């Protein structure tokens, strides 16, 4: 079977599955009790879910969010065949110790039970995931809404074919090239220094805001045509023109204050530009592969309402901390809850999966910090409605502390 034929079969299956969901939701006539999400008009400004994005989008549709999103940004795995790590930094002032350890962030290897990433079975599993998410995202979008799909050279060519089929070729708006300086190089091919973001509209009457950028193509001489407003800075004379489809924005540097250690973290400047281009204050926007929450923070900062999810404990915790630190009202939901026992401060044992890849010295130090200064492992705390406190540690694990334990 040819690849395009296989892709078409995957797309048609995804459409059929989404259509079946729409029929079930419509025939029910009410929000299923198990969904747990508030109705669109009753939701807080920001919703964050820990769970599989396909399941979360289906639940949102079941709760009446179809057509509610003005913008959806998707930054899925790229089918790179690699497993990614996050850097977790721990500082114990009590012990005078600092520790930096690498822990699993997410896997970008794919299997359907027969093969791994790179195999035909693995590729088919990946494209099945992508097609289903794109179909669901389209259903969540408003008629004036835009989808932004962020990929790279591994799969963007096949994703374009998918989007043409799901949204329609006539709904393609742009292929944004995000150009950056970071990354390696090799003698085997030209250095790869960009990602690609495909932009599609749901319908013909879409909304988009094109920003302006400086154009210095006249050197130091002022423009001589009447009616053209020109400006001067230290570089020379320039006019303001509609922005182009190549965006030069640096990656988050290793020493940047913005950096939180999560693998493949995207810069806030890139996220803010997408938010501004595709939405207005008060609009609902979504990121259903939210990672450490950069898009959600950008949206909240710019006055948008947001909804996002990630299946990783660590990613969801980092995204929540962004909202918490910014003082933005949000509600956190867990579809894949994995909490520590009530009252536990997160003691680490030799069997703990988090310790498996650590060096012996790092493992010993982490166990010592957990034993003698457990508060150093706390990323943040929140109060629960019943008066208990919820603690989230630097690895994204959760525990609940009752009021009596503080007495």
Listing of model-derived features with the role each one plays in the protein:
Residues 1-41, 45, 54, 61-70, ...:
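Accessory, often C-terminal, charged low-complexity segments
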Residues 37-41, 102-120, 249-260:
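Short glycine/proline-rich turn/loop motifs
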Residues 47, 146-150:
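Short catalytic-loop micro-motif centered on adjacent basic/acidic residues
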Residues 51:
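Cofactor-binding loops of NAD(P)H-dependent oxidoreductases
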Residues 65-146, 211-234, 301-302:
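SAM-dependent methyltransferase catalytic-core segment centered on the flexible catalytic loop
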Residues 67-86, 163, 285-299, 308-309, ...:
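Conserved proline-anchored active-site loop of SAM-dependent methyltransferases
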Residues 77, 151-153:
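Short strand-turn motif at the edge of the Rossmann-like AdoMet-binding core
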Residues 130-133, 147, 159, 266-275, ...:
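Extended, hydrophobic alpha-helical segments in both membrane/secreted and soluble proteins
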């Amino acid at each position: 079977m040819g690849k395009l034929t296989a892709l078409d079969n995957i797309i048609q299956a995804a459409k059929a599955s989404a259509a079946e969901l729409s029929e079930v939701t419509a025939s029910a006539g009410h929000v299923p009790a198990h969904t747990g999400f508030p109705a669109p008009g009753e939701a807080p400004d920001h919703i964050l879910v820990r769970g599989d994005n396909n399941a979360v989008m289906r639940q949102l549709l079941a709760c009446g969010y179809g057509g509610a999103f003005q913008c959806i940004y998707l930054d899925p795995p790229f089918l790179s065949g690699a497993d990614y790590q996050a850097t977790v930094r721990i500082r114990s002032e009590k012990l005078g110790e600092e520790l930096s350890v690498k822990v699993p962030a997410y896997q970008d290897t794919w299997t359907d039970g027969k093969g791994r990433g790179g195999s035909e079975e693995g590729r088919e599993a990946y494209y099945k995931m992508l097609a289903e998410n794109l179909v669901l995202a389209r259903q969540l979008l408003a008629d004036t809404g835009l989808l932004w799909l962020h990929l790279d050279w591994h799969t963007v060519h096949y994703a374009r074919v998918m989007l043409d089929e799901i949204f329609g070729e006539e709904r393609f708006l742009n292929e944004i090239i995000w150009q950056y300086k970071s990354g390696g190089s090799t003698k085997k091919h030209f250095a790869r220094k960009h990602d690609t973001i495909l932009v599609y509209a749901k319908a013909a009457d879409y909304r988009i805001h094109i920003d302006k950028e400086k154009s210095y193509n006249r050197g130091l001489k002022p423009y001589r045509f009447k009616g053209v407003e020109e400006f001067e800075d230290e570089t020379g004379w320039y006019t303001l023109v509609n922005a182009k489809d190549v965006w030069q924005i640096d990656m988050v540097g290793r020493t940047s204050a913005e950096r939180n250690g999560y693998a493949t973290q995207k810069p806030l400047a890139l996220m803010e530009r997408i938010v501004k281009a595709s939405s207005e204050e008060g609009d609902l926007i979504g990121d259903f592969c939210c990672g450490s929450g950069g898009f959600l923070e950008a949206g909240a900062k710019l006055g948008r309402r947001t909804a996002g999810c990630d299946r990783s404990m660590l990613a969801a915790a980092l995204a929540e901390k962004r909202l918490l630190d910014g003082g933005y009202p949000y509600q956190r939901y867990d579809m894949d809850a994995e909490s520590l026992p009530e009252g536990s401060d997160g003691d680490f044992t030799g069997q703990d999966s988090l310790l498996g890849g650590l060096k012996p010295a790092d493992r010993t130090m982490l166990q010592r910090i957990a034993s003698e200064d457990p508060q150093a492992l706390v990323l943040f705390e929140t109060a629960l409605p019943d008066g208990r406190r919820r603690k989230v540690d630097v690895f994204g694990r959760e525990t609940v502390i009752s009021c009596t334990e503080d007495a």
